[in-house]
């Protein structure tokens, strides 16, 4: 009925299917090089109807890490609230201003990321976590950086 090669093909197909299943369930995010725009995973809550027309130099950047993915620095040009919703239901709400960031809410159990408070350029050297806010259960790390630290030219 089935020859040796048929069984080999069936076993290989099953192993490939099992491997893909494990990869999709592991939470590892895959993307194309250059596909690390933070606005791909962030949704602004109540964006303003009209954007500011005054172009001031960017003083701060938010670097977002979700799981194993590090996103490009997001310039902080105005006050905004962003929602980070992951496909497995993990949610974080991030509040940013031109020079600060804090975790407004999260659906993690311990809420340590919210208790870490605001990071700005005045307090970041005195904080235990320096310029970072970390949500371990949701695998989210927020970093407040200067343009030089973020590796971008000051605008």
Role assignments for model-derived ranges:
Residues 8-25:
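Hydrophobic membrane-insertion alpha-helices, especially the h-region
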